[in-house]
Amino acid sequence: MCSNLMNLGQDIKTLEENGADMLHIDVMDAPFVPNLTFGPDFIKAMQAVTTMPVDVHLMVDDPELIMSKFPVRKGDIVSPHIEVKKDYRALAAKVHEAGGLFGLAVNPETDVEAIKEYLDVLDTVTLMLVHPGAAGA
């Protein structure tokens, strides 16, 4: 969201050559947050230029739909928001089956206790310090 998209392929290669071991991408769909960013095709394009795992932060109303349109690779992280209230066990199973890691993101105003019932399927948790959707926040 804060990078020059015209140079992103080269930037990814430069990061990889200099020791980066993971990339992060924010996927926003406009209904869940006030911005619209990258989608599944962009994730696939990133995956095509690197073997580094991609940390996909899904700030979307329908994480199942987005997840069905890009491959989760070994080491990739997929983190939808707890506020969407989906079947996170089924989503986690799909991600784990592909060799990826599953997480949940939590908005600042949401009680962190909301993720308690999913702790047994979580590999990571993202605690948002600002409401999602703000660039560089």
What residues fall within each predicted segment?
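Beta-hairpin (beta-strand-turn-beta-strand) motif
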Residues: 59-61, 83-85, 107-109, 130
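Short glycine-/acidic-enriched loop or helix-start segments at secondary-structure transitions
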Residues: 89-90, 136
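Histidine/lysine/aspartate-rich catalytic loop segments that bind and position anionic ligands
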Residues: 105-137
